[in-house]
């Protein structure tokens, strides 16, 4: 039988294939990038075994588990495990604590399918603990600088040009603003934290110890930043990205209208454009109170007209009206206030190429 593996660093640095034997409800609460959920027990079976354990003890629970996962059900699951193991011979299996469930899966794979497959010592809990420690050590040992700038300046594009950037919005699958929802959902908060920690782990392994982050609020959509990170972001130095108003309008038009509507149609097919319209109007309604009734009504009329024209002809030019209005009357005044508030921390300000060069040079000088 294979020895339990505890080199968690290797597992994440090399993207080892992972077979997660926990129940689906556990998996959806939090898992690791690329892990595949092939449970020993489904949610109902797990609940029944848990209730039995509570009232009748471990042995009775084990016996019930073997009754529930037997015959064709057992054969089907072993077949799925064996297929995964043969397809991914460099992978591992795990359960919550590296206990009975992964042990049973490992034993059945060996006895029923002739497959000897290693499991992770400590299971999900140990892997998760390793990533929490990874994040905490990065925050303690590394330097961070924030990238700020008004809406539409292309901060995400700048991050993509830097090898030492950490894309919080990418990990959260959200653009970070009130209009930031994507056509696909966001990860669970645990998944978000895991992705962030693995990103930092890989970059540190490549010799990077200074990171560039976009200046974000505590919550990116539904994903909350780890509190120690957010607290640090209140003190980190900042670089401010600038761009012409016209360029910002065009970038927002591309990102939040052209690309997002295409994304919705790719995901939802014929219903995609309708869902995109609903999402855009919902995003505007979410800032109703901050806009005020009159401004909200005016912007909504402009947005509805633009969406109607886009639906009829595919033309997107009318969207510029509400984009310009939102920037001038809502976002820009808010960002001007924020820049004044954070002015003492801004060590450089400039347009895209100047900011990229500054951040690259900054990384070299502090390496």
Swiss-Prot record:
This is tRNA 2-selenouridine synthase. Involved in the post-transcriptional modification of the uridine at the wobble position (U34) of tRNA(Lys), tRNA(Glu) and tRNA(Gln). Catalyzes the conversion of 2-thiouridine (S2U-RNA) to 2-selenouridine (Se2U-RNA). Acts in a two-step process involving geranylation of 2-thiouridine (S2U) to S-geranyl-2-thiouridine (geS2U) and subsequent selenation of the latter derivative to 2-selenouridine (Se2U) in the tRNA chain. GO terms for biological process: tRNA wobble uridine modification. Belongs to the SelU family. Keywords: Selenium, Transferase. Monomer. HAMAP family: tRNA_sel_U_synth. It is an enzyme of class 2 (transferase). The active site is at residue 95. It comes from the Bacteria. It comes from Pseudomonas fluorescens (strain Pf0-1). The keyword rRNA-binding does not apply. InterPro entries: Rhodanese-like_dom, Rhodanese-like_dom_sf, SelU.
């Amino acid at each position: 039988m294979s020895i339990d593996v505890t080199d968690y660093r290797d597992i994440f640095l090399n993207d080892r294939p992972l077979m997660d034997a926990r129940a689906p409800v556990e998996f959806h609460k939090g898992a690791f990038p690329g892990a595949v959920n092939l449970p020993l027990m489904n949610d109902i079976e797990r609940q029944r075994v848990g209730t039995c354990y509570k009232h009748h003890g471990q042995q009775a629970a084990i016996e019930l588990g073997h009754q529930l996962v037997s015959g064709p059900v057992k054969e089907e699951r072993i077949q799925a495990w064996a297929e995964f193991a043969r397809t991914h011979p460099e992978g591992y299996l795990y359960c919550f604590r590296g206990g009975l469930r992964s042990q049973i899966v490992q034993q059945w794979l060996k006895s029923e399918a002739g497959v000897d497959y290693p499991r992770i010592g400590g299971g999900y809990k140990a892997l998760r603990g390793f990533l929490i420690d990874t994040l905490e050590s990065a925050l303690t040992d590394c330097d961070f600088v924030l990238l700020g700038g008004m809406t539409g300046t292309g901060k995400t594009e700048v991050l993509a040009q830097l090898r030492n950037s950490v894309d919080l919005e990418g990990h959260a699958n959200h653009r970070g603003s009130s209009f930031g929802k994507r056509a696909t959902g966001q990860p669970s908060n645990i998944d978000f934290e895991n992705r962030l920690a693995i990103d930092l782990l890989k970059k540190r392994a490549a010799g990077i110890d200074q990171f560039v982050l976009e200046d974000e609020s505590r919550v990116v959509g539904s994903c909350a930043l780890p509190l120690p990170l957010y607290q640090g972001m209140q003190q980190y130095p900042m670089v401010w990205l600038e761009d012409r108003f016209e360029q910002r309008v065009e970038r927002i038009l591309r990102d939040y209208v052209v690309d997002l509507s295409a994304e919705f149609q790719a995901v939802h097919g014929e219903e995609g454009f309708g869902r995109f319209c609903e999402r855009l109007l919902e995003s505007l309604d979410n800032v109703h109170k901050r806009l005020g009734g009159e401004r909200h009504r005016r912007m909504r009329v402009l947005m509805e007209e633009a969406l109607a024209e886009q639906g009829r002809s595919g033309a997107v030019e009318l969207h510029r009206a509400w984009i310009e209005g939102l920037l001038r009357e809502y976002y820009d005044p808010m960002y001007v206030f924020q820049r004044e508030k954070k002015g003492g921390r801004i060590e450089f300000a400039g347009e895209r190429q100047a900011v990229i060069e500054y951040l690259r040079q900054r990384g070299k000088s502090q390496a």
